[in-house]
């Protein structure tokens, strides 16, 4: 049971990072919502322990990009678009489990401009909210991938 004033100071956090894509993007990778660290750095998968950049670099046969500019160039060079399912929500820290009051991102903006052939969701939370808010509207199924978040301790790059 919650205390009456427990949620008093909670307010929606608005997604601060624009999507990365261009007309020749073929793959769209969706996260749920940026972590605190990503919001601080101003770019996707900003936590140093997040495995996203290591995994995508390995899949693409490239070195792991380090700077935001290198990461953007890497994504575009490999025809990868990146964004998140959620535009705003109430969230405690970076905890996906605490997400509520979701407003979805307008993913159709990317799909109308880019040659997206496959949509992937990075983790269960992104997939859950994609299916809830986007799948029917867009008429596109997404593939659920293991989360690259450091919170997903059961999964590693080596596996």
Task: Say what each PLM segment does.
Residues 37-98:
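Short, surface-exposed acidic-centric catalytic microdomains
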Residues 77-126:
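Internal catalytic-core helix/loop-beta-alpha segment
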Residues 1-26, 48, 93-104, 108, ...:
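C-terminal capping/extension of enzyme domains
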Residues 34:
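N-terminal phosphate-binding or glycine-rich loops at protein starts, especially the Walker A/P-loop
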Residues 29-30:
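N-terminal nucleotide-binding beta1-loop-alpha1 segment
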Residues 50, 126-127:
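Alpha-helix N-cap/helix-start and coil->helix boundary motif
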Residues 54-58, 109, 113, 132:
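Residue-level signal for well-ordered alpha-helical scaffold segments within enzymatic catalytic domains
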Residues 37, 128-129:
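Short, solvent-exposed loop/turn segments at secondary-structure junctions
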């Amino acid at each position: 049971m919650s205390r009456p004033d427990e949620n008093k100071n909670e307010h929606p956090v608005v997604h601060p990072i624009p999507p990365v894509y261009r007309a020749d993007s073929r793959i769209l990778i969706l996260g749920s919502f940026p972590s605190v660290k990503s919001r601080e750095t101003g770019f996707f998968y900003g936590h140093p322990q997040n495995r996203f950049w290591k995994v995508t670099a390995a899949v693409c046969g490239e070195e792991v990009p380090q700077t935001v500019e290198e990461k953007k160039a890497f994504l575009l060079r490999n025809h990868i678009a990146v964004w998140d399912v959620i535009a705003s929500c109430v969230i405690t820290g970076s905890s996906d489990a605490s997400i509520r009051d979701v407003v979805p991102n307008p993913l159709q903006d990317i799909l109308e401009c880019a040659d997206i052939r496959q949509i992937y969701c990075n983790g269960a939370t992104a997939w859950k909210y994609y299916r809830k808010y986007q799948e029917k509207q867009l008429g596109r199924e997404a593939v659920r991938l293991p989360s690259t978040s450091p919170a997903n301790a059961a999964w590693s790059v080596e596996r």
